[in-house]
């Protein structure tokens, strides 16, 4: 999508699974590790901390009665667009194919449990949680059993769920930019997906030390429409 701006905007993703999928909790853990856990997540480390491509990168699953979606997104300077796509896509490919680190998984579980009280920080949050339990016909002990179900998930469970439900070779990319080289983009994605080719990622030394601030949004979202931070409805 052509758009005249100093910032380029990138989203890549594909359809995913339903809310009642047995892998859902493992996928929520995986997402927290990949891009849903702030500065501790893989995408933030690769795109912001190491290279300064963006102020923020995130990933997300949506789950409902019908098939939801998996996506990752970020914004960057126009002249860093192709390098950033190479890094983000390669990080996703590696996440799918490399083993899950057991210590990182346990830290992610602990973080999810610590953030659980945020789901009940207001009457509206409590009402939403109870409504979700009723709508999806979950057991009355669903919330009480949540920590035990979370603790029972192993690195292999997460790895199997990732390989079943995340497909770097089947992504749809939406790129808002005033200068996109589609042939170069196709070449980058093909190289990332080829296990026989070892690519060198853009090194932090190649990146300017200062990132220009993003352009202000034309209209701020109202408090009623603002999205809340993690965790989503459990």
Predicted regions located by residue number:
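Proteolytic maturation boundary segments
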Residues: 1-2, 155-234
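M16 family metallopeptidases and their MPP-like homologs
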Residues: 8-18, 31, 44-155, 168-176, ...
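Short Ser/Thr-interspersed hydrophobic loop/turn segments at strand-loop and sheet-helix junctions
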Residues: 39
